[in-house]
Amino acid sequence: MARKAYQPKRRSNSNQNQQRSDSLKKNKQDNLRSKSAGNQQGNEKNKKDIQDQRNKASTKKKRESSGEKYESARDKVIRRFRPGDNALKQLRQYNQTPSLLIRKLPFQRLIREISTRMTEEDSLRWTSFALVLLQTVVEDYMVSFFEDANACALHAKRVTLMSKDLALAARIRGQKNVTGIFIPTKK
């Protein structure tokens, strides 16, 4: 006995269409009630509602044609980027900006913490210019180090940067005491 292949249920707009038709029926019923009752206020209210609906529809069309913002999130066109396009876009933005990439205050706290660990004095005093200069040097060093590590990954015919690439880049540079880099060993 052959089994049928699983076919997922397709979503349709029937629910939305049902809601629209229900609201139209309700409006028609309200119009008939107000006419039969002879209520002038109800007629004026319904006329205003109908005019408002027409105005909304016309402004929506105008917005779509003129390129203005859309009325709701459902009306937006979802744009999909190819994989890697957003990363390249961010890299271009970072290359164009002359500002520092690492936040200043966390970097200053780290420098002060390291300087208190290295010296026996209570605290060294740093000028703001010295901290900015140190930060630019550190960022340049990190960029060049990651470029070397990326070259090691490409040499291994990989795109993913791994810890062994960082260790190899540090070893080629002649840095023997590289801490924080875990090199897995095979048993």
Swiss-Prot record:
The keyword ATP-binding does not apply. InterPro entries: Histone-fold, Histone_H2A/H2B/H3, Histone_H3/CENP-A. Residues 1-12 have a biased composition (Basic residues). GO terms for cellular component: chromosome, centromeric region; nucleosome; nucleus. Residues 22-33, 44-55, 64-76 have a biased composition (Basic and acidic residues). Residues 34-43 have a biased composition (Polar residues). Histone H3-like nucleosomal protein that is specifically found in centromeric nucleosomes. Replaces conventional H3 in the nucleosome core of centromeric chromatin that serves as an assembly site for the inner kinetochore. Required for recruitment and assembly of kinetochore proteins, mitotic progression and chromosome segregation. May serve as an epigenetic mark that propagates centromere identity through replication and cell division. Belongs to the histone H3 family. This is Histone H3-like centromeric protein CNA1. The lineage of its organism: Eukaryota, Sar, Alveolata, Ciliophora, Intramacronucleata. The gene is CNA1.
